[in-house]
Amino acid sequence: MNKVKIFISIILLMILGAAISYADSNMNTKYSTLKSSLECINAEYEFYNVKYNSEIEYNISKEKLKKVLFNIVKIFGVSQNEIVYDENWNNKKKEIFINVELENIKISINGIKKNSNEAYITVDISEHKVYKHIEDDYNELEKLLKNYSSNTEIYACIVGKYTKKLQNDKYDDILDEILYNMSAEEIHKIKNEHFLSAVAYGKVLRYSELNYLGKKINLNIAIRYKEDIGETYVYIASPIIKIDY
C-alpha cells in the first residue's frame, strides 16, 4: 500500500509539473536557498540539476537560433571541441541539438521550431558537481533566456548524500531542518522504511508555485536510502523534483 501511495504521489507531482510557467524568477536566490538548506543538514554535496523550457519567437531564423544555443554553452566555459552538434532542419522538422558531457557537468540544449506558431529552447543541465561560485553562471543564463522569452519554466534540484544508512527517525529530523531553513509549511508527506517524500510551501521561495491537493506548493524534498551502495541521498527541489531518484 505504501508503494502504491508513493507511486500515485510521484505521478501527481509530474502532472502538476507540466503546468508550471513563470517569467520572472531569480536563479541566484533559488540556488543559494537550496544550497543553504543542504548545508544546514550537513549533507555532502553531490550535484545540482536545473531544467529550463523557454517559449521563444516562432519566426526566429536558423542562424539566430544556432547563435543563441552556442552562447548558452559559452556561459559554462565549454570549448568548441567539447561540443557535440547536430541539426535536423528541413520542411518537416526544424531542430538543433547541442550536447556536452564533461566530468563535472552535462549540458543538453535543444532549439525547436515546432510549427509556424511555436518555437522553444530547452536547456537541461545535469550533474553539475561544481559547488561554489556558480551563481553568476546561472544568472547570466537566466538573463540570456529573458532576452528571447517571457515565458520560461524552471525546475531546480540540489542533491546531497550521507555515506551511511540513517536511522528512520532521522529522516523526519532532516525534513524538519530543511522546512525550518526555508520557513516552509509541510503540505503532504509519505514515508516508509527507506524513503521519505514531502511537498511544502516555503516563504523564502516566492515564485514557481503549483497547486497540490488544493494548496500551494513550491518545495519538494525526498530522502532515499540506496541499499546497493549503502548511502542515503537527499533531494531538495523547487518547485518539484524532475529527476529520477
Task: Give residue ranges: language-model regions.
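Beta-strand elements of well-folded, non-transmembrane domains
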Residues: 56, 127-129, 162-164, 225, ...
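Extracytoplasmic beta-rich ectodomain segments of secreted or membrane-anchored proteins
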Residues: 70, 74-170
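Short, hydrophobic/proline-enriched secondary-structure or compact coil segments at domain edges
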Residues: 46-56, 116-126, 232-239
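N-terminal leader/presequence regions that precede the main folded/catalytic core
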Residues: 1-105
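A cross-kingdom marker for long, charged
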Residues: 205-245
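Intrinsically disordered, low-complexity segments enriched in Gly and acidic/Ser/Thr residues
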Residues: 162-215
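Soluble, non-membrane globular domain cores that form compact, hydrophobic packing
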Residues: 9, 16-20, 24-35, 135, ...
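Solvent-exposed, acidic/flexible segments
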Residues: 58-65, 134, 168-171
